[in-house]
Amino acid sequence: MSNLAKQKVSMVSLGCPKNLVDAEVMLGVLAQQGYEITMDEKEADVIIVNTCSFIKEAREESVDAILDLADRKSDGNCKTLVVAGCLPQRYQEELAKELPEVDILIGTGDYPRVAEILAEHHAGDAQIKYVGDPNYIYDEDLPRLNSSPGWYAYLKIGEGCSNCCTYCVIPSLRGPYRSRPVEALVAEAERLVKGGVRELILVSQDITRYGSDMDDTSSLAGLIRRLAAIEDLKWIRLLYAYPDGISDELIELFKTEPKLCNYLDIPIQHISDNVLQRMKRRSSEEQIRTLIARLRNEIPGITLRTSLIVGFPGETVDDFLNLTQFVEKAQFDRLGVFCYSREEGTPAAEMPDQVSERVKRERHRKLMKTQARVSFRRNRAMVGQTEQVIVEGYSEETELLLKGRTSRQAPDIDGQVYITSGHAEIGDIVACKITDSSDYDLVAEMIEE
């Protein structure tokens, strides 16, 4: 083994779970080549920052992380700073010029070559850039080092996006939508489950588009059936399901497949037709309202999550009032709100009637306040119910309390359950009775068998 391969590597992954999978692939490739992976950035010879560039706040977070870690080159062990992902894919020349502390820039199409690129850099001293066409798609033969807790993992079922939302830069950063083959996904899922994973969370830019670019009859529902046949897999969770792609077949599967969590993340972005049309979304207000009502009616107890954008160009006072009233009526269990970010190169950036930052922030505050009331009522209604909870560790406040998630809660983005009684191993799925609630979290007692 070369001295290069004995170096320690640390990874900082920013942004969404899809980014996290890319980071895990890079770590897997490096570990396979003999690099030692460390969680301690102070020990690392090589630090990789896997960046997000979706909106302004994500870019700022990425740049702040890069600048912070650049200091490690002067006061720590770090000799090589790598910036990967969406930020260099979008701003390679600017980063190379403004951040000379960065040694390597890797775009979204070159993750599997990370070890090769490091070797090339160490053979010379110059800053190097690998930012080509974003045509990479994860292959199951690539090693992947799961950085999530061992009982759950994200399964990236496709790459890129073929939607044409006027506010979004993702298609230019990730390319058109490409589905991964069913057999490849099943093979990866089986490997993850064999390693102890009990919950698979399906992700891509638009999971309902899965199979639409393939010549066979592959579909999201068909993929779920194949995954559900894996013996020791307990939960399958769906994130990023576009409303216009939710099929009758998928709705039926929620009724019949016990491993499919009664949970659906549907990013609708807005409800007013005026805004939806300017966003170039494919669903209308009537279609969205009909879908939400149908899901509530046909799948009793389903947990619905969505994301919304406030302050989009041309959003009027009436549009925002309509959105607020819709949030009250739809009663989403979970909801995220983003202020519109004016992204260079997108059609929306050139639209008239841009909304001021002050108005955006005020609308964000009002909508989150509305949702807090909804969430409190939804959680309060769960008191007295029995739920299956996956145990994830001890509470930050005291080791006398366990914490976990019900099947109604996704990792990181939803609340937690604090378990006040009983004993279980981390990763166990146990029955708990909900005894109390807050806006976003639950309290429960374990039901002893």
Swiss-Prot record:
Manner of cofactor binding, per the entry note: Binds 2 [4Fe-4S] clusters. One cluster is coordinated with 3 cysteines and an exchangeable S-adenosyl-L-methionine.
Residues noted as binding [4Fe-4S] cluster 1 in the record, renumbered to the chain: C16, C52, C86
Molecular function per GO: 4 iron, 4 sulfur cluster binding; aspartic acid methylthiotransferase activity; metal ion binding; protein methylthiotransferase activity
Predominant cellular place of this UniProt entry's protein: cytoplasm
Annotated TRAM domain residues: 380-448
Gene3D superfamilies in UniProt: Methylthiotransferase, N-terminal domain (3.40.50.12160), Nucleic acid-binding proteins (2.40.50.140), tm_1862 like domain (3.80.30.20)
Keywords for the protein's UniProt record, in alphabetical order: 4Fe-4S, Cytoplasm, Iron, Iron-sulfur, Metal-binding, S-adenosyl-L-methionine, Transferase
Binding site for [4Fe-4S] cluster 2: C161, C165, C168
InterPro entries per UniProt: Elp3/MiaA/NifB-like_rSAM, Methylthiotransferase, Methylthiotransferase_CS, Methylthiotransferase_N, Methylthiotransferase_N_sf, NA-bd_OB-fold, Ribosomal_uS12_MeSTrfase_RimO, rSAM
Highest rank taxon of the organism: Bacteria
GO terms under biological process: tRNA modification
Cofactor(s) the protein needs: [4Fe-4S] cluster
Compartments (UniProt record): Cytoplasm
Catalytic function, reaction form: L-aspartate(89)-[ribosomal protein uS12]-hydrogen + (sulfur carrier)-SH + AH2 + 2 S-adenosyl-L-methionine = 3-methylsulfanyl-L-aspartate(89)-[ribosomal protein uS12]-hydrogen + (sulfur carrier)-H + 5'-deoxyadenosine + L-methionine + A + S-adenosyl-L-homocysteine + 2 H(+)
CDD domains listed in its UniProt record: Radical_SAM (cd01335)
Residue ranges constituting the Radical SAM core domain according to the UniProt record: 147-377
Protein EC: 2.8.4.4
Domain (MTTase N-terminal) ranges: 7-123
GO cellular component annotations of the record: cytosol
UniProt xrefs under SUPFAM superfamilies: Radical SAM enzymes
PANTHER family: RIBOSOMAL PROTEIN S12 METHYLTHIOTRANSFERASE RIMO, RIBOSOMAL PROTEIN US12 METHYLTHIOTRANSFERASE RIMO
HAMAP family in the record: MTTase_RimO
Family: Belongs to the methylthiotransferase family. RimO subfamily.
Protein name: Ribosomal protein uS12 methylthiotransferase RimO
